Amino acid sequence: MKFIFAFVLCLAVAQTALGAIIGHDKVQPFAQPDPVTISEKAAVKYKPQLVIFDSCVSFPAVNAAGDITGGLKGTSGTDACTKAPLGSQVYGRSTWYQGKWAMMFAWYFPKNFWNLESRSRHLWANMVLWLDNPALETPTILGASLSRQTLEVPKWLFIPSGVQQKNSYSKATPIPPMGFVGTQQIRTARIGRFQYTYNYTGGSTISTRVSQSYPDTSGWVGLDFTYLDGQYQDLIMWNQLTDQARAALESADFGRDTKVPFNDKNFEAALAQAWPF
């Protein structure tokens, strides 16, 4: 009897240490702290905007106590996920990688989508922005890598209804002009039946804009550069999270199809896959 009591007590202590699984709309996001270090200042300066097309908005995945989101069942389209009532969140982590400064920005979504249909619970998406040196007054953006899903495509009558992606990142060096906040495209001349030349006016040289949309005609939802301005979310860097939140993101099980890309377990491997040079 004493053994059973001790075992149950240990389970309770472990659960308290790791936090609980709570409703997707009950997770309190972290407020964006004032940046102090060089890496924090660069991350805030180059934080991207996110635009949502036909899928869930981004939600916080963990709170200060280490409680983890339970996500949403992959049914009923965008029901219950068109607005994050407590606010959205973008997560960040930076490091030197093969002589370039890599800044990962990651978003969590409570549902995953294929071809405009909600299909499963949980999705992590991320963007890696590559700089020359974060210590410079205005670092140069060398390129960007946007995550995509390599899941098997659904089948119709045993026939795949699309093409399965082989690479987990799309890569751009340099970033296309329309990938920057505020940029407008102006058609200047026609050079073929469906071909034109363009000029690009205005826009930032620092802040990028990406969409959670469908880069292919049909397929799994993923990140892509977009022609519309979006919204910023409060940024919390990996080292700014509480110990409980970091521990929760290390141990949380979001399923076999999506992983936390910026935790200790996955960060280096993600940068290797995202490397565009």
Curated annotation (Swiss-Prot):
It comes from Phytophthora capsici. Residues 1-19 form the signal peptide. A motif (Hepta-peptide GHRHDWE motif) lies at residues 119-125. Glycans are attached at N199. Pfam families: NPP1. The keyword Ligase does not apply. The keyword rRNA-binding does not apply. It comes from the Eukaryota. Belongs to the Necrosis inducing protein (NPP1) family. Keywords: Glycoprotein, Secreted, Signal, Virulence. One of its GO terms (cellular component) is extracellular region. Secreted effector that contributes strongly to virulence during infection by P.capsici. This is NLP effector protein Pc109095. Induction: Differentially expressed during the developmental and plant infection phases. It is found in: Secreted. Key residues/motif important for the effector activities are degenerated in most NLPs, including the nlp24 peptide consisting of the conserved region I (11-aa immunogenic part) and conserved region II (the heptapeptide GHRHDWE motif) that is important for phytotoxic activity.
